[in-house]
Amino acid sequence: MNDLSHTANDALRVSVLSEALPYIQRFAGRRIVIKYGGAAMAHAELRAAVFRDIALLACVGVQPVVVHGGGPEINQWLKRLQIPAEFRDGLRVTDADTMDVVEMVLVGRVNKQIVNGLNQLGARAVGLSGSDGGLVEARPWGDGSHGLVGDVARINPDVLEPLLNKGYVPVISSVAATPSDGRAHNINADTVAGELAASLQAEKLILLTDTPGILRDRNDPESLIRKLRLSEARQLIEDEVVAGGMTPKTECCIRALAQGVAAAHILDGRVPHALLLEVFTDAGIGTMVVGRENHSSEADN
């Protein structure tokens, strides 16, 4: 590589850092809740990129909170243990045997893998389940016909405040107990992330998915909608432009925004460093939904 190439690469790095500076200043000390799952969890290179993004966010003074799922690994263990996997209404039907596997995988394996990966990068991560300290109180989902599938009844943010204020990165698995009988329930990780973001009055809720974001035409990746107001997001659901698996994710964003979260983002976790591209660049990626008109005019991110 010649001197001119070195100079061009150095100039590009300086330009990237310069572009990131106002966002670093804006979000220092702010809380960002990240739902981590999908392809970004399944592939080693993407997993490493997500860990580096989260570690960098913490390094520059942002307070990230990570909520994770782990569906593919749960399925692998169910198959290994010859326990049939059943889904109904998009939810995993969870009997007692399945719940044991869910808890083992999410709390005992996936959570520790994320914590170890972040700690290797100096991020000071702490692993928790929703049950720890009563962080998340569960209630049975619907009429109980899905077994030990839960919904969020209450969030106790006091569990996280000391950790965040001392620079730790909470990593939370979406398993929580019902206070009446202490039984563990499997809760959708998007739901937990959204309710945590609202309870912490987070600046941002970020959902890493396996799609580019909200599409005007779900069969056309080029029809990505980059920015929506809360009212527009509701209208897209009503008009069935948002449908299928994107509906609960969009509804999760809407609930978080309605409770005071400034912005919610649906990003393509298959894109390396999607988190940094969304938070620290002018263009961003994915879809941003904003709940306040003035937030949209303050910044594109």
UniProtKB/Swiss-Prot annotation:
Record bears the keyword Transferase: yes
Localization: Cytoplasm
Binding site for substrate: G70, G71, R92, N186
Documented EC number(s): 2.7.2.8
SUPFAM superfamilies according to UniProt: Carbamate kinase-like
NCBIfam families: argB (TIGR00761)
Name under which the protein is recorded: Acetylglutamate kinase
